[in-house]
Amino acid sequence: MPAVYKRILLKLSGEALMGDAQYGIDRTVVERIVVEIAGVLQLGVEVAIVVGGGNIFRGMKSAGDGMDRVTADYMGMLATTMNALALHDAMRRNGVVSRVQSALRIDQVVEPYIRGKALRYLNERKVVIFAAGTGNPFFTTDTAAALRGMEMNANIVLKATKVDGIYTSDPFENKDAQRFRNLTFDEAINKNLQVMDATALTLCRDQKLPINVFSIFKTGALKRVIMGEDEGTLVII
């Protein structure tokens, strides 16, 4: 059976990279994520990734603690670049060819974001890892994922989290919480379900770009989503 999606935008939160730790990058977790990505590449799927930085630095929290918000957001963007390099290195060790592009210029470390080059890399079956969010303060990496998904002509945005979908309430606190198999964008926004921030949701809704929220910690979940199986929660128009 062929994959349902030809090109995906995978949103990896920084928290997903730290596993059960309280901070930093868990190399074992990163290696396992790379193996999952390699599996979908073998299906002929083209993969672009937007990575968060919350495992290293949380800009909004620091701003709430008194730091200038713009400074805090730029620090968060640098944290995403560290995560992107960690992913890139793990891919190299596993034989996956990837390129890192940053919305902030750090030319001695990573390439600047150039849409045409990113599209060419995807056509060449290289994984493209986008760092530094949108390059602008006040915008989350969720919004960056929506933006890059549209710019890369992705068929879907896949948000990889610690939870296997969107629930009626927090499944860690309520064992009776029910997983939604499907939601509309308006339902997600009106019910204030924590899918993505409102800006990202609205962008995806307006461009008719579906989102699937799934657990990156479930072995094979990424492949099952790609194959169109009942995995995670699909958010559509």
Curated annotation (Swiss-Prot):
Q: What is its main location?
A: cytoplasm
Q: Could you name the Gene Ontology cellular component terms for this entry?
A: cytosol
Alphabetically, the GO molecular function entries are: ATP binding; UMP kinase activity
Q: In which pathway does it act?
A: Pyrimidine metabolism; CTP biosynthesis via de novo pathway; UDP from UMP (UMPK route): step 1/1
Q: Which reaction does it catalyse?
A: UMP + ATP = UDP + ADP
What influences the activity of this protein, per its activity regulation comment? Inhibited by UTP.
What positions does the entry give for ATP binding?
K11, L12, S13, G14, G54, R58, T161, Y167, D170
The compartments listed are: Cytoplasm
**Top-level class of the enzyme under EC nomenclature:** transferase
What is the purpose of this protein?
Catalyzes the reversible phosphorylation of UMP to UDP.
- How does this protein assemble? Homohexamer.
Q: What is this protein called?
A: Uridylate kinase
> From what organism does this protein derive?
Nitrosomonas eutropha (strain DSM 101675 / C91 / Nm57)
Q: Which gene encodes it?
A: pyrH
